[in-house]
Amino acid sequence: MDITIQHPWFKRALGSLYPSRLFDQFFGEGLFEYDLLPFLSSTISPYYRQSLFRTVLESGISEVRSDRDRFVIYLDVKHFSPEDLTVKVLDDYVEIHGKHSERQDDHGYISREFHRRYRLPSNVDQSAISCSLSADGMLTFSGPKIHSNMESSHSDRSIPVSREEKPTLAPSS
């Protein structure tokens, strides 16, 4: 059974109405009028329609899947290189940290940093966990599940991030 954890349906469909839209991982790329005043843009230009799913499709995707055989986390980290990322397993949690120093872009200078923490299922084999970064900036963290009644041993360790040359197919539900 494949379990996908996502935002509630009402938050996905009406994502542009929530102020938190400004603070997702799509930061630092400039703001549009509908980011600040979503109702004003439709009043001024009634023929202009922002996609209701823009938030989900274009912002930092974080998708967790847990099926019978493995546990997978997909995380959009397109602004970071493998050297900017740190992935650690600490007890029952995986912590992903990304930070890059100040860089110049079209609008000035920008620096980015994020922290994500996910709880690992107790039956994930922590010794076989892998992590890779695709060419399109999708970080894939995965670990196989143990099918016996034994629980996985817990240890604190860093997981190296390997670089893949091909893009990841976008995770789909």
Curated annotation (Swiss-Prot):
Q: Which SUPFAM superfamilies did the record assign?
A: HSP20-like chaperones (SSF49764)
Compositionally biased spans, kind Basic and acidic residues: 153-167
Q: Which residues carry this modification: Deamidated asparagine?
A: N123
The source's superkingdom equals Eukaryota
**Which residues are involved in binding Zn(2+) 3?**
H154
Residues modified as Deamidated glutamine are Q6, Q50
Chain positions carrying an annotated carbohydrate: S162
Annotated region described as Disordered, given as residue ranges? 144-173
One GO MF annotation is: structural constituent of eye lens
Give the InterPro entries listed for this entry. Answer: A-crystallin/Hsp20_dom, Alpha-crystallin/HSP_16, Alpha-crystallin/sHSP_animal, Alpha-crystallin_N, HSP20-like_chaperone
PTM annotation: Acetylation at Lys-99 may increase chaperone activity.
Write out the entry's keywords from A to Z: Acetylation, Chaperone, Cytoplasm, Eye lens protein, Glycoprotein, Metal-binding, Methylation, Nucleus, Phosphoprotein, Zinc
Residue numbers bearing the N6-acetyllysine modification: K99
In this chain, the stretch annotated as Required for complex formation with BFSP1 and BFSP2 covers: 1-63
Q: Name one GO biological process term.
A: protein refolding
Residues annotated as binding Zn(2+) 2 are: H107
> Which residues are in the sHSP domain?
52-164
Q: Where in the cell is it found?
A: Cytoplasm; Nucleus
Q: Which residues are recorded as binding Zn(2+) 1?
A: H100, E102
| N-acetylmethionine found at | M1
Q: Which residues carry this modification: Phosphoserine?
A: S45, S122
GO CC term (a single one):
nucleus
Role played: Contributes to the transparency and refractive index of the lens. Acts as a chaperone, preventing aggregation of various proteins under a wide range of stress conditions. Required for the correct formation of lens intermediate filaments as part of a complex composed of BFSP1, BFSP2 and CRYAA.
Subunit note: Heteromer composed of three CRYAA and one CRYAB subunits. Inter-subunit bridging via zinc ions enhances stability, which is crucial as there is no protein turn over in the lens. Can also form homodimers and homotetramers (dimers of dimers) which serve as the building blocks of homooligomers. Within homooligomers, the zinc-binding motif is created from residues of 3 different molecules. His-100 and Glu-102 from one molecule are ligands of the zinc ion, and His-107 and His-154 residues from additional molecules complete the site with tetrahedral coordination geometry.
Write out the similarity annotation: Belongs to the small heat shock protein (HSP20) family.
This protein's name: Alpha-crystallin A chain
Q: What is the species listed in this Swiss-Prot or TrEMBL entry?
A: Didelphis virginiana
